Structure formats: C-alpha cells, structure tokens
Amino acid sequence: MSAIKEIPVNLPKLLTLFKTIVPKLTNDKYKGQYGRIGVIGGSLEYTGAPFFAAISSMKVGADLSHVFCQANAAPVIKSYSPDLIVHPVLDCLDAVDKIQPWLERLHVIVIGPGLGREPLILQTVTNVLKLCTKLQKPIVIDADGLFILNDNIDLVSGQRNIILTPNAMEFRRLFGEDVNDVRQKMSCLGDGVVVLEKGVNDKIHIPHTNEVYSMPTGGSGRRCGGQGDLLSGSLATFFYWSLQSNQPNPAYIAACASSYLVKRANSTAFKKFGRSLLASDMINEISAVFRSDFEDAETG
C-alpha cells in the first residue's frame, strides 16, 4: 500500500478554478436550476444546525433548500427563516416513503446536521441514506450522519459522489489513529468518496490515491458552534455546481471551495466581532466573500 502523500493546495490556481464552476446569473433560467438542496436533520435539541446548513446553501447561491426534520423541530426551524421549506417527517413511521418523492427532485442531499442519536431516527436516516445511494444522489455526510457510519462504513464504500466532513474526533472514530489503519479503511471507500477533514488546516483526502490536500490555515481562533453546518451547506451547493460544470474532480473542487469560503467568512467576521463571533455573523459575510473571491466582475 502506497504512503500517504500530503500536498499543499495551489491556492491561486484554485481561486481561478472556483470561478469556472460558479454559474452565471441569466434571465433564461427558472427557479431551481441553480440548485435544489435537501438537509436531513433537526431534532428538538438541535434546530440551529439544519438551519445553518440550509440557509448557507442558499446564501452561496442554491435556489431552494429543504429541511427534513422531526416534527417538534419544524416550527422552530420555520421561525428562523421563511426562505426554507421545512418537512416535519423524520419521526413518522412512513418517513422514507414521505421523503422519497422529494429526494428524486433534489440535486444534493446533506445528511446529519442536528440529527441527534435517537435509535429510531438513526435507523430511518440509515434507510434514507440507502435510498439516496440507490437514486445515485450526490451526498454530503456530517455530524450525526457520520455517527451512523462508525459501524456501517460499507453504506458508502464503493458509492459515487459522496463527501464526508468529519472533525478530528469524528475522523478518528471513522478511521482510527494509526496511519496504517487509516490507509486501510480509506482504501475501502473506493474512488467515489472524498473526505474533508476539518481542522486548523482543513485536509481533503482522496482515498483511492492516498493523496491528502492541505488547505491554508485561514479563519481565526474563534471556534463557535455552527461553523461545520455552514461548511456542509455551502459544500452542497458547490458540489452541485462542480458536477454540472463537468470538472474531472468535482468532489475535490467543491470541498476546497467550501473550506476556503467558510474560513474566509470566519476571518472577515472575526475582524468585526472578535471573541463575540457567532455562526450567524459568518452567514452575513458569505455574500461579500463570494463576490470578492468567487465571481468575475461580469458574473452578476
């Protein structure tokens, strides 16, 4: 088995590449063509996470974002924003049947934000994940969605267009700490799964080549809750655009783009708020960062 190769990204080249995947705004498009995103998550205790993911996908540029949550979380999530479409179905006995018609219309599915760990909910979402892979939907898996994979990594092994977004602890739970264990478990994922490991320097793992691309540090020392949800939501939109632009490595490009955007939003907001910085402050910076670094002057 070949050694893991850690490679610093070429940031100037990436910034040029990012602009090639961003679709130009034109009058001949209809609602939904710039992205329809689904977020599977949201429980009584965790209503902020699915909101952050869903609204971030739209702030980046998706047209529509749906949240599929537990019934007791729905009124709270609805109250956060009228821009989101909220489905209170996750704790229904026929949840998968209710979700399936929507899945067929969505471009990318985010699984995990605010999901919680109730056994019945986790089993339902496991079945939703199986359905997503059957429908060949691009998937981003984060937070408690990754918890499902701890003992069931085969759910994604060999599948196409899947991005996992673990933090350092979630990464160790999934792949272990010993470098040989990491390589062995990574190799089982196949060539259709990319891992975005979140940290001071986000790292994008390409499992089938043993390559690890290291992003610049960026961000700030402020680590408030919700930043990972901003990442998963923005990643979903970038993933759809990257796939639509027929880039040879769409998951890698999307992972780099979302990592860069969130770090820049954190850095920009930190200059204003310092230690008081919250994830909601970062959301308000997405537009300025996007215009500055992701769009050509004529994109509009």
From Swiss-Prot:
SUPFAM superfamilies: Ribokinase-like. GO terms for molecular function: ATP binding; ATP-dependent NAD(P)H-hydrate dehydratase activity. It is an enzyme of class 4 (lyase). It comes from the Eukaryota. PROSITE patterns: YJEF_C_1, YJEF_C_3. Its EC number is 4.2.1.93. GO terms for biological process: metabolite repair; nicotinamide nucleotide metabolic process. Disulfide bonds: none annotated. Its cofactor is Mg(2+). Catalyzes the dehydration of the S-form of NAD(P)HX at the expense of ATP, which is converted to ADP. Together with NAD(P)HX epimerase, which catalyzes the epimerization of the S- and R-forms, the enzyme allows the repair of both epimers of NAD(P)HX, a damaged form of NAD(P)H that is a result of enzymatic or heat-dependent hydration. NCBIfam families: yjeF_cterm. This is ATP-dependent (S)-NAD(P)H-hydrate dehydratase.
